[in-house]
């Protein structure tokens, strides 16, 4: 068995989300179908995060397994097209690239990536990297931290270029209040007030290690989030609440009351999915 790790970038606008669903085309379904087409094997993708409909990704991480060509033991394989370089096997021995030339090209990680990217056209999905990894690697459970960002366009008129990629807010936002309020959310808390009613997480306790409101490129506002894991809609619900604070509909001091209330109805609205990006995963 060979395990592959790939990084995926996608525009989530025209998809029902990451996960396979019966009511529309998902990113998982499309990727699995194209990988299977090239490899002639049934593939099951495991992702670091299951993004919702309309959410984008710059660095979604997935893994999948392929049966080895000899169907009996793991093989070392070329991860990229280079010459005269040693490649490590999963049993920590080494072999030269020359000895691997008989390996079918569909098991070569670089050629697999190139072929799948070709098959994905014209869909706005692309593999930005692909490599063979250890069987112990798991895209979801091996993750140490996940990073998201949310993009807001805060000006009088919407952006034609950034349509479906940002949240346009016409009224000027009080960014100072948004920054002040956001800092009360850093740390380990019960985030029930920012949790979707459909969330399946066993516990509402999460540790938010970073939340940063960046106005460097104003009128674009970017809000960055980092945590080992997130609740369903947690980032979008926090953004919606911060925007209400920026619009003076909620006072900055109220963020602590909202957090401790453990009541979703007290927080702001769920921000649109179009502004959310899954940036990267740390392992």
From Swiss-Prot:
Indicate the residues that form the catalytic site: 52 (nucleophile)
Keywords of the record, alphabetical order, are: Isomerase, tRNA processing
UniProt GO BP: tRNA pseudouridine synthesis
Top-rank EC class of the record's enzyme: isomerase
Question: Does this entry carry the keyword tRNA processing?
Answer: yes
Q: Which reaction does it catalyse?
A: uridine(38/39/40) in tRNA = pseudouridine(38/39/40) in tRNA
Molecular function terms in GO for this entry? Answer: RNA binding; tRNA pseudouridine(38-40) synthase activity
What InterPro entries does UniProt report for this protein, alphabetically?
PsdUridine_synth_cat_dom_sf, PsdUridine_synth_TruA, PsdUridine_synth_TruA_a/b_dom, PsdUridine_synth_TruA_C, TruA/RsuA/RluB/E/F_N
Enzyme Commission number(s):
5.4.99.12
Name the positions where substrate binds.
Answer: 148
* Record note on quaternary structure: Homodimer.
Biological function? Formation of pseudouridine at positions 38, 39 and 40 in the anticodon stem and loop of transfer RNAs.
What the record says about family reads: Belongs to the tRNA pseudouridine synthase TruA family.
Q: What is this protein called?
A: tRNA pseudouridine synthase A
Q: Which organism is it from?
A: Orientia tsutsugamushi (strain Ikeda) (Rickettsia tsutsugamushi)
What is the phylogenetic placement of the source species in the record? Bacteria, Pseudomonadati, Pseudomonadota, Alphaproteobacteria, Rickettsiales
